[in-house]
Amino acid sequence: MSVAVSPLAPKSYPDMPALRGVRMATAAAGIKYKNRTDVLLMVFDKPASVAGVFTKSKCPSAPVDFCRANLGSGAARAVVVNSGNANAFTGVKGKAATELTAKSAAAAVGCSEGEIFLASTGVIGEPLDASKFAGVLGDMNVRAEADFWQEAAKAIMTTDTYPKVSTRTAEIGGVIVTINGISKGAGMIAPDMATMLSFVVTDADIEPAALQSLLSAGVGPTFNSVTVDSDTSTSDTLMLFATGAAAEDGQVKVTSADDERLSSFRAALNDLLKDLALQVVRDGEGARKMVEVTVTGAENDAAAKKIALSIANSPLVKTAVAGEDANWGRVVMAVGKSGEMADRDRLAIWFGGVRVAVNGERDPDYSEAETTAVMRLEDITVKVDIGLGQGTATVWTCDLTKEYVAINGDYRS
């Protein structure tokens, strides 16, 4: 875990309210890190509705396979997360580790192994010794608390420099419900599902199918629109749980994602997902600047997003941002290599509110002083208009610094 907190970290953290129906505990198992917690147990007092989206990597981790197999039941009683070891590319040993963890968690909580969900993050390719923490899950269940969100977020960190938490409230049929979420991620971040690891819990009463629809729709403009280094993790897991405790306040169960009562909840959920996703980018390994890339005028929205990601993932664009150089030529390069339709002579490019290029050449009113002032900011916007259609998209990334190389060059040591 990095020592210095990212300069882009939040200046303050929200007060995370206790959420009815869920309790958490952490433990220090010494999986990779010393003198810190590295295991999280999240317990649902009653079966919670569950939804999930996972990595599209063709080399998924053993916990991802395990979660996918259990997701169809629609019910969760516990989640076990460890940091320091991804339990990915670990063969039969990896599967055995998930089975031991699930068996131990089920015994600790008093449920079936089909109601257990697992996630691991850390080094890929090294066997996970689940016996280091499987034996303490019973004790963790006993001491689990409802008001433990910050500590839960800390336990799942790897190269993160700060815990990522967020909370929102919404209304369903006149009943106020709460949504809390935690995330981890700083490297191996690219949009192809969700984020690295993220767990969101609400006390709303929503059936699993509706919950899944809400989550699947929410990841597109949020977690699927952020990138740090274009590398999609083998372990990406985003799960949404609904404890149903709001039924005690009179909330009538939601059975369909088309239910009009979900309007406020959907907006709050999407806002929380975006908040967590942007916190991940702000903690990008070695990051010193946050970059928002917006593409307009593409053939369609899908084309706009592909172009935006081509820009956001370009090492040359990202290093130019790190060097505070408004090098629009690199943006042009990234547009051209995206594989989408573009007309060089129609392109227009802005850094912040300063137009630097138009009609395929440098803006005749270009101001070096104005552009330099923009590039010195911590939060930078880049806008590109393709000039061909109505497609639009926005993605977020960070700069690429020497610290990123140092962090990843030393990661296994």
From Swiss-Prot:
Residues that hold substrate according to the record? 158, 184, 195, 285, 408, 413
- What GO terms fall under cellular component here? cytoplasm
Q: What class of enzyme is it?
A: transferase
Identify the domain of life: Bacteria
Q: Which Pfam families match?
A: ArgJ (PF01960)
SUPFAM superfamilies for the chain: DmpA/ArgJ-like (SSF56266)
Q: Cross-referenced InterPro entries, in alphabetical order?
A: Arg_biosynth_ArgJ, ArgJ-like_dom_sf, ArgJ_beta_C
Where it mainly occurs, coarsely classed, is cytoplasm
Protein biosynthesis as a keyword of this entry, yes or no, is no
Q: Does the keyword Transferase apply?
A: yes
UniProt EC number: 2.3.1.35, 2.3.1.1
Which chain positions carry the site (Cleavage)?
A: 194-195
Q: Which family does it belong to?
A: Belongs to the ArgJ family.
NCBIfam families per the record? ArgJ (TIGR00120), PRK05388.1 (NF003802)
Q: What does this protein do?
A: Catalyzes two activities which are involved in the cyclic version of arginine biosynthesis: the synthesis of N-acetylglutamate from glutamate and acetyl-CoA as the acetyl donor, and of ornithine by transacetylation between N(2)-acetylornithine and glutamate.
Name it: Arginine biosynthesis bifunctional protein ArgJ
Q: Which organism is it from?
A: Agrobacterium fabrum (strain C58 / ATCC 33970)
Tell me what gene encodes this.
argJ
